[in-house]
A protein has these predicted regions:
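Fungal secretory targeting signals
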Residues: 1-20
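N-terminal carbohydrate-binding accessory modules
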Residues: 16-82, 93-115
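Residue-level detector of anion-binding/catalytic polar loops
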Residues: 79, 151-153, 332, 367
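Short, solvent-exposed turn/loop segments enriched in Gly/Ser/Thr/Pro and often Arg
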Residues: 84-89, 159-165, 209, 257, ...
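Aromatic-lined carbohydrate-binding surfaces of glycoside hydrolases
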Residues: 85-92, 144, 149, 153-173
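Chitinase-like catalytic core of GlcNAc-active glycosidases
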Residues: 89, 109-110, 114, 132-150, ...
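Aromatic- and acidic-residue-enriched carbohydrate-binding clefts of CAZyme catalytic domains
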Residues: 95-136, 167-180
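Extracellular glycoside hydrolase catalytic/binding regions
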Residues: 177-178, 184-205, 209-367, 375, ...
């Protein structure tokens, strides 16, 4: 008997297989690109979604469901999120005999019993699959599952050690060995989260540490350790731990001075004061094809696009140019934070910044994540329901703060970045 298969059915099967293949990992790096299992080049255009605050649950769920937050991100063309966490989340799991904290405890400890109870009820109303006994990592898992459904990549970012707003030179989280930045706990936390997130198909990268910076109130630590040699030493420790737990993860390495430059890591210069040079062989088994660099830029009051381009290039994007004679090691480089106020005088001051980035990032095909998706936080800097003037979303997360910015600058920036 001869089986007849209609052309329409055959086409639908092909489309179904193509969709099912997303994200088509494992991923690796080839020169300046991240590529999937087919060798297709992957670019990321996304937003930061913080989860490193005192509650240690990703923000905004008192206003929207996980599905709606990600649908809004997807609606303007974005294909990625930078999902942040605090090392303290893992510290608490170890202190609790390996058991994660439930949402009831997380919100009450983060916001106080009265307000925590009120906010939790709003979260549960918007996300009815959760209960008060749902754990924090189960929320992260739900975000990862929805990212898979909506084809949104995840960069999992260790943002801070002590769960709170970041960053400053006196916050105790500046540098390895600072008062709240225990090195062993950091290595353990990165490894734990790598093992946990290994099951997330949408995870494409894992960032080792957000914004290493000078400990301005800790002179002894600054004088002893705030240098490129120690950054390189600690990044190798963290990368080894993440790779051991999740060999498929692409690992993101940051630089000094709030991660505003990574030049010594790709230029071949000696890392001071030790004199060693970045060597992929130091990252045994993965240094050739699992490393990415990241930088941040907040020069949003500048009036010269050429100056901004120059700084972005010479502080990081240069590493993507294999023809540049000053580049010893070629890497993909991601701009994992940039941003500005969304309204008022501060937004107007940033006109050169937003227009320049909207043109330049697609031009260099750099992956990027804007800071930040948030409207109101659960709490920030001691203020509950803090409304972030830099946030893309309105205070109640119901829409965009600045539709003109989205339409005129951000959407073209997204489309240009992701254009094949």
């Amino acid at each position: 008997m001869k089986l007849f298969v209609s052309p329409l059915l055959a086409l639908s099967c092909l489309i179904g297989n193509a969709v099912a293949a997303w994200p088509n990992g494992p991923f690796k790096t080839e020169g300046r690109w991240i590529v999937n299992a087919n060798g297709d080049k992957i670019s990321l255009a996304g937003a930061n979604w913080p989860g490193h605050g005192e509650v240690m649950v990703p923000e905004g769920l008192q206003y929207q469901s996980i599905k709606d937050v990600l649908s809004d991100i997807k609606s303007i063309g974005m294909n990625a999120i930078r999902l942040t966490f605090a090392t303290e989340l893992v510290d608490q799991i170890y202190a609790n005999n390996g058991k994660d904290v439930d949402l009831k405890t997380a919100f009450e400890e983060g916001l106080g019993k009265e307000n925590g109870t009120i906010i939790l009820q709003k979260v549960l109303k918007n996300n009815p699959s959760f209960t008060a006994q749902t754990t924090r990592l189960e929320v992260y898992d739900a975000i990862a599952a929805e990212c898979l459904r909506q084809q949104i990549y995840i960069d999992l970012d260790n943002h801070i050690s002590e769960a709170k707003w970041c960053c400053g030179g006196t916050d105790g989280n500046t540098w390895w060995g600072d008062t709240q930045f225990n090195v062993d706990n950091w290595v353990r936390g990165g490894k734990y989260m790598a093992a946990h997130s290994k099951k997330w198909p949408a995870k494409i990268t894992q960032s080792l540490r957000n914004e290493p910076r000078e400990p301005t109130n800790n002179n002894a630590l600054r004088d002893k350790s705030y240098n490129w040699s120690d950054l390189y030493k600690y990044m190798r420790q963290g990368a080894d731990a993440v790779h051991e737990a999740d060999p498929n993860a692409i690992i993101v390495i940051s630089g000094m001075n709030y991660d505003t430059y990574v030049t010594p890591l790709y230029s071949g210069e000696k890392l001071q004061p030790g004199g060693e040079v970045f060597n992929r062989d130091d990252f045994v088994g993965y240094g050739k094809d699992k490393l990415v660099l990241e930088i941040h830029n907040y020069e949003n009051s500048g009036t010269s696009c050429s100056s901004l381009r120059y700084n972005l290039y010479n502080k990081g994007f240069q590493a993507m140019n294999e023809s540049d004679p000053n580049v010893a090691e070629v890497f993909p480089v991601m701009l994992t934070e940039f941003g500005q106020a969304m309204n008022g005088a501060d937004y107007n001051t940033a006109n050169t910044y937003v227009s320049c980035l909207s043109e330049y990032l697609p031009e260099v095909k750099a992956s990027w994540f804007i800071w930040v998706i948030v409207g109101r936080y659960y709490t920030r800097q001691g203020i509950q329901e803090f409304d972030d003037s830099w946030g893309l979303k309105k205070a109640d997360w119901s829409g965009w703060k600045n539709d003109d910015y989205i339409a005129k600058y951000l959407k073209p920036q997204i489309a240009g970045t992701l254009k094949k």
